[in-house]
Amino acid sequence: MKHVLISGCTRGIGAACVKKFLLNEWVVTGMGRSEENPFPDYSSIFHYVQGDLSSTEDRKRFVMEAFYKFGKIDALVNVAGVAPLERKDLLEMTEESYDRVMDINTKGTLFLTQEVAKKMIENPIQNGIRGHICNISSLSAYTSSTSRGEYCISKAGVSMITKLFADRLAEYGIPVNEVRPGIIATDMTSKVKEKYDNLIDGGLLPIARWGEPDDIADAVYALCSGALPYVTGQSLDVDGGFHLRRL
């Protein structure tokens, strides 16, 4: 069985990704901040590591436990991410909020990818591939939102992480891609549901509905399944057509 690591696995997009891989007969090691295992009924094929992505020790422990539990790592899905605790105008954004968001979303993603990549490079090559890495970015990587500037900057950083590792790891047969979710029904967007309901009703999206975590999980699995071995450094917009920027 193939083995995938998924950060931010306890809810929303991360939990949907866990389910998608389990249904396709992968074993999964997941990390999240919750003390409670989100999938206690799947102990033979799911291993949970409680930890904080911004912590160097927790990242290393996550990879170590994954490797000792299920062996070689075939895929990494970087889902873990946070929004600012409070939306503030760009002119009022604090260093504390910036540091918190960047430490998890960007720094954590960068150094977890680095840690896993070193393991993947040692994998035997099969059909030209040693492993797959998929980052979860956001439409905020290229869309200005001045009430949560730290989040936009962090996700733009994730997009560059994708490009950098795609370039660096191509010689080893490790494609690195990202999925850019649009307006997805998760805990993160629940606080602004009315705002986005009105925008969608007003024609913001060609596909006029909220996205679901399963929409993202389907795209992630496609990129990690081996079905697209000649694709790397690609950003896949799963956003109902938001990126079309219609007039």
Q: How should these model regions be labeled?
A:
Residues 113, 154-157, 162:
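Active-site helix of classical SDR
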Residues 138:
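Residue(s) in the substrate-gating loop at a strand-loop-helix junction
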Residues 118, 167-171, 229:
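Alpha-helical segment proximal to the catalytic Tyr-Lys
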Residues 87-90, 94-99, 201:
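Substrate-binding pocket helix/loop in short-chain dehydrogenase/reductase
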Residues 10-11:
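Conserved glycine-rich cofactor-binding loop
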Residues 205-216:
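A conserved structural motif in NAD(P)-dependent oxidoreductases
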Residues 203, 221, 232-247:
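Short C-terminal tail/terminal secondary-structure segment
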